[in-house]
Amino acid sequence: MECRNAMGCDYIATGHYAKTSQAADGTWQLHRGEDPKKDQSYFLYSLTQERLAHTIFPLADLDKEHDVRRIAAEQGFINAKKAESEDICFIADGDYAGYIERRCGHAAAPGDIVWRDGNVVGRHSGALRYTIGQRKGLGVAMAHPVYVTGVDAANNTVHLGEAEDLTAAALTANDWIWSAPADRMEAELTSGGIRVGAKYRYRQKDQAATLTRGEDGQMLLTFDEPQRAIAPGQAVVVYRGDIVLGGGTVTGALK
């Protein structure tokens, strides 16, 4: 938006698969894209009312495989048949850890792999190569399936445990941003909480939950059913139907 203002533009158009609508009272709504397999509204929760008013999604009602590629071919675009990226588009080789190391200018430091009882069971070549819920490529051989249950960046340790250790009933989140009108959302929040569909992973189906504010000021999302492998640092986004209400950054999982 700073770039839009600096250039004197009225709107920014982006190729994300999402859509907006304006209510009779002038407020804006951010919706999921028409194609559920391509929907990218999860990544756009930080678009506030002011930002939504100046954002256009030209692909909102188009199907990528048929409409978008056809239009691109008709216009002579050389990338009309280019294979799409399933992951981070600017890391072509998929080596996320290597990308971070190159950006930081040094290799990740090795550290301990710790079992649930506190005993060191192995060594890792960089904690950034592990994610909560990971089962393969751990570098540790045990007689039964084990999973990454935590990554302690401050102490450079990776923690392992059983599948049951990944289960949580709720999560906390900070840096919360409302995409829906903030005053209305805050009013609902203080009147007993907000029933939402929540996603803490991009490809995840909506999980029924209640959103409240905890005593520490963080958002508290309590799920109807136990959840698995909630990872701090991930975005959590809440919906009402196909409308994005807002989101924040996961800070922890609660049993």
Question: PLM ranges: what are they?
Answer:
Residues 1-244, 249-255:
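Nucleotide-activated chemistry modules centered on ATP-dependent adenylation/adenylyltransferase
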